[in-house]
Swiss-Prot record:
UniProt-recorded name of the protein: UPF0397 protein STER_0346
NCBIfam families: PRK13661.1 (NF010182)
High-level lineage: Bacteria, Bacillati, Bacillota, Bacilli, Lactobacillales
Pfam families: ECF-ribofla_trS
Keywords attached to this entry: Cell membrane, Membrane, Transmembrane, Transmembrane helix
Organism the protein comes from: Streptococcus thermophilus (strain ATCC BAA-491 / LMD-9)
A GO cellular component entry from the record: plasma membrane
Transmembrane segments: 11-31, 45-65, 72-92, 109-129, 147-167
Membrane topology: Multi-pass membrane protein
């Protein structure tokens, strides 16, 4: 258990650092303060490989630090939504266990259903309500911004996350594939 805890902490730290760096330097603005951000594909990879705790804290810590550094202001609802997305993807990790060298079509479907659920909770519920509480913005703007971000993140994870997981799975040795000479 102790070894697993160390692994989780190290993966979380590395993941949060990647979240910050990718989020600050690789983003494409699309609406308001919303942009296509590729760090969510990397977060999905870490969530699957290292589990839901790493996925949550990678998104939560990484997003909080990124916003604090980049904007000088932290939108806690969006930070929580990033964490929730990683948590949900990681919770369903057994459905698409890529560590065994396989990432089947059914695994891809489960992965994308899990990320859709995480994004729906995070960006369909948490961000609009949290921003209403924190910033008192108009509901129409909050839901529009959350919808655009959720869809952008879904597409990013569906393409980038699926590709990263497929590449990772192909780099693993499949169970039972080695034979004794």
């Amino acid at each position: 258990m102790k070894n697993n805890s160390i692994r989780t902490v190290v993966a979380t730290g590395i993941g949060a650092a990647l979240f910050i760096i990718i989020g600050m330097f690789v983003n494409i603005p699309i609406f308001g303060n919303t942009s296509i951000q590729l760090q969510y594909a990397v977060q999905a990879l870490f969530s699957v490989i290292f589990g839901p705790i790493t996925g949550f804290f990678m998104g939560f810590i990484g997003h909080a630090l990124k916003d604090g550094i980049q904007y000088g202001n932290i939108s806690w609802a969006w930070v929580l939504a990033s964490g929730i997305t990683g948590l949900v993807i990681g919770l369903f990790g057994k459905k698409y266990d890529v560590t065994m060298g396989k990432f089947s079509v059914m695994s891809m479907i489960w992965f994308n259903l899990a990320q859709a659920l995480g994004l729906l909770i995070g960006y369909g519920v948490v961000t609009p309500i949290g921003d209403k509480i924190q910033f008192a913005q108009a509901w129409s703007y909050l839901y529009a911004q959350s919808f655009v971000a959720g869809v952008a993140n879904f597409i990013t994870i569906a393409i980038g996350g699926t590709l990263l997981l497929a590449i990772y799975a192909s780099s693993r040795t499949q169970s039972g594939s080695l034979t004794k000479d």
